[in-house]
Amino acid sequence: MFKQLLAKCIEGYTLTEEEAYEAMMMIMSGEASASQIASFLSILRLRGETVDELTGLVKAMRNRMMTLDYEEEAIDTCGTGGDGASTFNISTAAAIVVSSLGVKVAKHGNRAVSSKSGSADVLEALHIDIQATPEEAKRALKTKGLAFLFAPLYHSAMKYAALPRKEIGFRTVFNLIGPLSNPARCKRQVIGVYSTQYAEKLAETLHRLGSEHVLLVTGKDGLDECSISAETDVVELKHGEIRRFTIAPEQYGLARGKLEHVQVRTVQQSAELLKAVLEGRANESAINIVILNAGVALYAAGKAATIREGVEMAKEAMMTKKAYEQFERLRMKEVEKYA
C-alpha cells in the first residue's frame, strides 16, 4: 500500500487527507522501509505539502501519541527549529515568564537536532526536571504551572522515521507537524516557523484540527521566534479567522537589538544566557526578545487582550523578579512525603 501512495506522489499527484493519514500510520507502525520513508519525505519537501496532507499526517501522529490527560487549558511555546541561527532557548525562557503569571504551559520539545541547544539540553544544564511520565507532567503543571513534554517519550512511534530523517539531513514535513502534535492537546499556541511560506498552511491545518488561538511567527531575519533584530511576520488563527500582520519591537517600546547578542555556541552558553535574562543581568537584546515572545504567548493564552498588554505584563514579571522566582521554583526538587 505504501508503494502505491509513493508512486502516486512521484507521478505528480497530491494525497488526500485520508491517504496521508494512512501513509503516516504505516510509517509509525514500521510497515514502510527506511528508504521508502526517505523517498516520501523528499518528494513532499520538493513539491510542497498541501493542507490536506498536513492534516492527515497530524491526525495520524496525534492518534499514535501518548497523551496527557490534563483538563485545564494550557499553552505551548514551540518551534519548528532548523532556522540555523544558533540562538539561546528563547521559547523556553518565554515559557518560564508566562508560567510565572499563572498561565499553565505544556512545553513540547526535544534535544538539539540542527541547533546548538534543544530545550531538553538546556533544561538539563539548568537542573530543571524533565518529567519522565505523563503523571509527573500533570503534577508539575498542577504544582508549578509548567511541564516539559519530551517529544520522544510521547511520540515513540516516530522511531521508525529517525534514521531516514538523520540520513537525508534536510528539514522535512516532520519539522512542521511535530509542533502541531502537543501531547496535552493545547488549543492555544505560539509556533515559531522557519519559513513564512509554511505559516498559512499550518494555520489552515490547525483550524481544521480545532485550535482556538495560535500565532505562527517568523522573523524577517529567518528566526523561528519573534525577532528583536528585525520585523516579524505573524499569521494568527483566532476563533476560526486567519489574518496576517507584521510586528516590530519598537511597537511595544522595545529597542531593536542585534542578532549576535542572542546567539550562542554551546548548551552551557545558552543555559547561562537564559539564567542571566531571568536575573535581569543579560544584555538588552536578550532580555527584550524574551519579553516580546512572552508577550505574544500571553496574548495567545488569553491572559492579555493584546500583544501590547502581554508585553507589559512580561516586563513587569521580569522587573519584579516574579519570572526569576518561578525559575528557582522549577529548579527545586520535589521531596517525597510518606505517611
Curated annotation (Swiss-Prot):
Question: Assembly state and interactors?
Answer: Homodimer.
GO MF annotations in UniProt: anthranilate phosphoribosyltransferase activity; magnesium ion binding
- Its recorded name reads Anthranilate phosphoribosyltransferase
Q: Which residues bind Mg(2+) 1?
A: 91, 225
Residues noted as binding anthranilate 1 in the record, renumbered to the chain: 79, 110
| Cofactor: binding comment | Binds 2 magnesium ions per monomer.
HAMAP family referenced in this protein's UniProt entry, alphabetically: TrpD
- Name the cofactor(s): Mg(2+)
**UniProt feature coiled coil, ranges:** none
Q: Which UniProt keywords apply?
A: Amino-acid biosynthesis, Aromatic amino acid biosynthesis, Glycosyltransferase, Magnesium, Metal-binding, Transferase, Tryptophan biosynthesis
Q: Where does 5-phospho-alpha-D-ribose 1-diphosphate bind?
A: 79, 82-83, 87, 89-92, 107-115, 119
Q: Which gene encodes it?
A: trpD
Residue positions annotated to bind anthranilate 2 are 165
Residues the record lists as binding Mg(2+) 2: 224-225
Per the entry, what this protein does is: Catalyzes the transfer of the phosphoribosyl group of 5-phosphorylribose-1-pyrophosphate (PRPP) to anthranilate to yield N-(5'-phosphoribosyl)-anthranilate (PRA).
- Catalytic reaction equation(s): N-(5-phospho-beta-D-ribosyl)anthranilate + diphosphate = 5-phospho-alpha-D-ribose 1-diphosphate + anthranilate
User: What pathway does the annotation place this protein in?
Assistant: Amino-acid biosynthesis; L-tryptophan biosynthesis; L-tryptophan from chorismate: step 2/5
The enzyme's E.C. designation: 2.4.2.18
Which Pfam family, just one, is annotated for this protein? Glycos_trans_3N
